[in-house]
Amino acid sequence: KNLFFPVNIAPSDKCTIGGNISTNVGGLQTLRYGNIEDHINGLEVVLSDGTILNFLNKLKKDNFGPKLWKLFCGSEGVFGIITRASLKLIPKKKYNSTYLIQTNSLNKSIRLLKFLRNKYFDNLTSFEIIFPIPSSYLFNESTHHFNLIIEIQSNVIGNYKKELKKYFNLKEFKIYK
């Protein structure tokens, strides 16, 4: 209850946990929560000769040598196929604010990212930069924009919009509460 798996993959209805682990995906909230490898307790894998390796451990504290199951994270199935996984869930934050911002300045976008990471590090979950369509550069159109999608999650209501307005002419996409 009130827990979630923080690796948010865009085509989540089209992928599997084993496939995600074998490619060590990051997802839409990697900025805050890291890659899928950071949210695994253990794995069960099947090698090409049919040998089953069980790295599932019920103990939270496990300081016994290297975590051999980590070899399978990002190996894209080269070492074996992942058949079971024990995943870490984390507490869900109460409030989620999402903003869409347009700017013509990539430098300003990067400065905003640095500002938000310094000020709201524990709450900044996503910062996506969508680059302009390349054809807009070819035809010298002045309407090209960098689109930023920013997501901030918190357990208290914050006035993030005010902070963002310091940097941009904010166009609010949606605020979820």
Model-derived segments and spans:
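Noncatalytic alpha-helical scaffold of FAD-dependent oxidoreductases
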Residues: 1-177
